């Protein structure tokens, strides 16, 4: 199988340019197909994410969402199709499962400053904390954090890289309802105040409705796409996700 990741440089969004550039794509995926052994897990998927947009890939467990994300971020290279990125190309990626050695004594502050590869770690962390409330967690041990607190720390780490695009794979899967809503409010704020674009996956329709600009329903292939209001009225959506409406 062949794969093709392409990067294109484009000016960052500034001031009056935002309305124009926001119509342009920061990410395009064209005809992505992926097999695991003889099983086709992604079937001819094409879509785009625009500057300043929140796009959610919505689908059932086992429907190929994580496999698709792993293609987009370059982890899985054994696919057919093309992935193109535009912009300055700062990309933050928050996987569904991340391995942190919870047996090693390590504060949140140490984790953020010493697992980050930028040259201005302390300054970048300070900038990140303007948006993500992790200052109260800095002296806590990583092993003591709840699932929601861990995701906030990892999101803060993503922001330290000054990304143009943040890709979140099932970021709220271990959170309670209140924590989920707070996390999605934070994501919406990051788009508004930082000018980032967000692509995230979810299997929970009700939580993503409040902040997504566009939803792409995927069950190995794209079944429907549109605004949250449009997809809930789509017959294909109702047939694939009857329990989510």
From Swiss-Prot:
Binding site for ATP: 59-66
SMART domains xrefs: AAA (SM00382)
Domain ABC transporter residue range list: 27-244
Catalytic reaction list: Zn(2+)(out) + ATP(in) + H2O(in) = Zn(2+)(in) + ADP(in) + phosphate(in) + H(+)(in)
Primary site of residence: membrane
Cellular compartments per GO CC: plasma membrane
Keywords per UniProt: ATP-binding, Cell inner membrane, Cell membrane, Ion transport, Membrane, Nucleotide-binding, Translocase, Transport, Zinc, Zinc transport
Cross-referenced Gene3D superfamilies: P-loop containing nucleotide triphosphate hydrolases
Top EC class, one word: translocase
Compartment(s) of residence: Cell inner membrane
A Pfam family that the UniProt record links to this protein: ABC_tran
GO MF, any single term: ATP binding
Keyword Nucleotide-binding: yes
Function per UniProt: Part of the ABC transporter complex ZnuABC involved in zinc import. Responsible for energy coupling to the transport system.
Subunit text: The complex is composed of two ATP-binding proteins (ZnuC), two transmembrane proteins (ZnuB) and a solute-binding protein (ZnuA).
Family statement: Belongs to the ABC transporter superfamily. Zinc importer (TC 3.A.1.15.5) family.
Official protein name in the record: Zinc import ATP-binding protein ZnuC
Taxonomic lineage: Bacteria, Pseudomonadati, Pseudomonadota, Alphaproteobacteria, Rickettsiales
Gene assigned in the entry: znuC
